[in-house]
């Protein structure tokens, strides 16, 4: 993408800073001409991470004009900047769910920068951006930077006691992940317990968001060698996702019956990757257990089959364990799955 940059020529005494590292810039984006970089490597990283999505959107926001200094212009720029925040947030979340942590950094940084422009420094509205940036650096192993970002997020929350359950849930989840990565397991369990509480208050006990906390807590107990607790937590996660996917599948099949030419997958690709990792981890654990329950293995395998089908990846369905075709009765959640063989999945996509 080096063709998208030009050497920076500025009047003497005028300096610009790099979009990624805030060091002195020597290059300029040739398309928008309002974004600057210290070198071609940072330009390329930013282009892949977020800039190609927002390049032209930055022009009116970063170009001073008589209109932009008037009240109507300021309001318009504020709305455009809020739109940028949402775009950057969605891109960062998508890349994180796909495990592309390095690519998520520019989007998370842009989200944070725009959030500061709109809401000011040290405000609770910056917390989602702090956590996105922390999650990206967590995946890259930059734990010192993660701790710093988490401190800033925690301080913003402490100053805003009125902030909602969703913010607290996300903060505790990220804190739990940090303590898990640093080996402080008791602290991690404390934060995951709080994560589950706040998530259940915001989304409900049966929510897939809430069950994410159970899965992360189970990972801690895996490290502590507590298979019985792990099995119990995994069962909760597996049943929640199976129920959710079964409902999505039923709705998708109904849509196919109304519109047989539909080719769009019914499940977001990034989320499919993330949920697939969760379910495969549970399946691997249950298959290795000496006290494994065939119904639990079948439940998880069937969930993976539904996930692949909903994501449009039918080729992976045939490679799942055949136990996914058994009839399963879920007495705890009162959900009954009857006669849904994998071959029926394939027939819908022919």
Go through the PLM ranges and name each one.
Residues 1-350:
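Intrinsic-disorder-linked linear interaction elements in eukaryotic regulatory proteins
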């Amino acid at each position: 993408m080096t063709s998208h940059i030009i050497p920076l020529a500025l009047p003497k005494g005028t300096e610009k800073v790099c979009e990624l590292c805030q060091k002195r810039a020597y290059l300029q984006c040739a398309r928008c001409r309002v974004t600057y970089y210290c070198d071609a490597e940072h330009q390329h990283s930013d282009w892949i991470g977020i800039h190609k999505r927002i390049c032209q959107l930055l022009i009116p926001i970063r170009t001073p004009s008589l209109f932009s200094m008037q009240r109507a212009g300021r309001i318009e720029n504020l709305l455009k900047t809020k739109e940028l925040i949402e775009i950057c947030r969605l891109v960062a979340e998508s890349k994180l769910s796909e495990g592309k942590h390095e690519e998520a950094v520019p989007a998370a940084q842009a989200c944070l920068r725009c959030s500061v422009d709109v809401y000011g420094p040290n405000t609770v509205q910056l917390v989602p951006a702090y956590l996105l940036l922390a999650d990206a650096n967590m995946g890259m192993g930059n734990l010192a930077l993660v701790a710093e970002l988490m401190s800033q997020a925690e301080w913003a929350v402490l100053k805003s006691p009125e902030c909602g359950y969703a913010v607290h849930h996300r903060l505790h989840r990220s804190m739990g992940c940090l303590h898990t990565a640093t080996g402080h397991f008791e602290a991690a369990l404390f934060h995951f317990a709080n994560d589950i509480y706040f998530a259940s208050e915001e989304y409900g006990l049966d929510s897939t968001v809430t069950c994410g906390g159970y899965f992360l807590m189970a990972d801690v107990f895996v490290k502590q060698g507590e298979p019985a607790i792990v099995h119990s937590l995994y069962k909760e996660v597996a049943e929640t996702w199976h129920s959710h996917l079964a409902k999505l599948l039923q709705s998708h099949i109904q849509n196919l019956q109304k519109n047989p030419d539909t080719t769009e997958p019914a499940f977001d690709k990034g989320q499919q990757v993330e949920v697939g990792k969760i379910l495969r981890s549970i399946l691997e654990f249950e298959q290795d257990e000496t006290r494994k329950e065939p119904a639990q293995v079948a439940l998880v395998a069937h969930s993976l089959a539904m996930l692949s089908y909903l994501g449009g990846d039918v080729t992976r369905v045939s490679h799942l364990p055949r136990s996914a075709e058994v009839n399963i009765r879920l007495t705890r959640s009162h959900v009954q799955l009857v006669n849904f063989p994998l071959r029926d999945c394939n027939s819908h996509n022919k």
